[in-house]
């Protein structure tokens, strides 16, 4: 029986990538800086002390981080009791966004640029907004700028409730984000609007990676908070991913947990399970691992690392999240059978100590555990697509166009 358990720790970078200078991210190091702040006693909100992640250490994260940056994270040394193969990978996709990272992991790097809304104010062209307004029968939008999601709902949420005008905003990523109140605007209306925006972007050749629904609740700016009902309406993959190949060539199953299905536009997904919150995502993953049959991929994205702690530059929260995940990791490891593969990786960085609120261009860990495979150092992988190619080889699928087998 062959099964792959692929877990993406969203934004868990381990040191700036070779091309980080193109993104003004030289020196960024999501993992390393979290470890440093914990060691120095500067990440004690809701937790305390040095970062405690024994299971990640056992899988090789410390050794992988050292190979990525040339030095061990502060307070750690070489781990000799590692049970997994470990290495690190750099991205060849043009962007440092979720879609590019996940597609490249699945063997389809995004080599051409997405369309970006670069203007900080009046970010979306009036001609585009007018098309959306007419088709959606809206009276208008508010926002239309680069913004942090939590900041903009605090600033414009009350006006949105009064006017029923959706809040639209973007970032340095290729995204069109729409924030609406779940009660006063309606969750189904928000999803319908996002589908309309996705349709118009595609029709008029705006190569925008994602339209993101950002629902929130609360009665005033002191109470507004985003809910777990976020949805991503992604552009469809323009080549066959390894998850689609598994379904097509082996009649396999791909169980998508969290926002995975949205990232691939539902393509190559057999079953979509919506879970929210780090603990629940881990519980759902464990539940599906126990049920997984032959020729199955259980594919989980742990979004909280990115959305709750990375973008919000919350070092303590990120550290606490890593410790929570590590506490669930022992059970995950125990469920991996002789012919299974457990793969832990990330899609980009989002250093909570870095300037701004955006992603950071970083190397990502590649940790592969299987009781039936001899552990080794995987080296510096020159593309995330090596993960997709490794999965393709493991399931005896036809070769992917990018990447090399690591095993």
UniProtKB/Swiss-Prot annotation:
One of its GO terms (cellular component) is cytosol. It is found in: Cytoplasm. Belongs to the phosphopentomutase family. Isomerase that catalyzes the conversion of deoxy-ribose 1-phosphate (dRib-1-P) and ribose 1-phosphate (Rib-1-P) to deoxy-ribose 5-phosphate (dRib-5-P) and ribose 5-phosphate (Rib-5-P), respectively. Binds 2 manganese ions. This is Phosphopentomutase. Its EC number is 5.4.2.7. One of its GO terms (molecular function) is magnesium ion binding. It comes from Buchnera aphidicola subsp. Acyrthosiphon pisum (strain APS) (Acyrthosiphon pisum symbiotic bacterium). Its cofactor is Mn(2+). Keywords: Cytoplasm, Isomerase, Manganese, Metal-binding. Pathway: Carbohydrate degradation; 2-deoxy-D-ribose 1-phosphate degradation; D-glyceraldehyde 3-phosphate and acetaldehyde from 2-deoxy-alpha-D-ribose 1-phosphate: step 1/2. The keyword Nuclease does not apply. The keyword Cytoplasm applies. It holds the Pfam family Metalloenzyme. Mn(2+) 2 binds at residues 306, 311, 359. SUPFAM superfamilies: Alkaline phosphatase-like, DeoB insert domain-like. Mn(2+) 1 binds at residues 10, 347-348. GO terms for biological process: 2-deoxyribose 1-phosphate catabolic process; 5-phosphoribose 1-diphosphate biosynthetic process; metabolic compound salvage; nucleotide metabolic process. It catalyses: 2-deoxy-alpha-D-ribose 1-phosphate = 2-deoxy-D-ribose 5-phosphate; alpha-D-ribose 1-phosphate = D-ribose 5-phosphate. The gene is deoB.
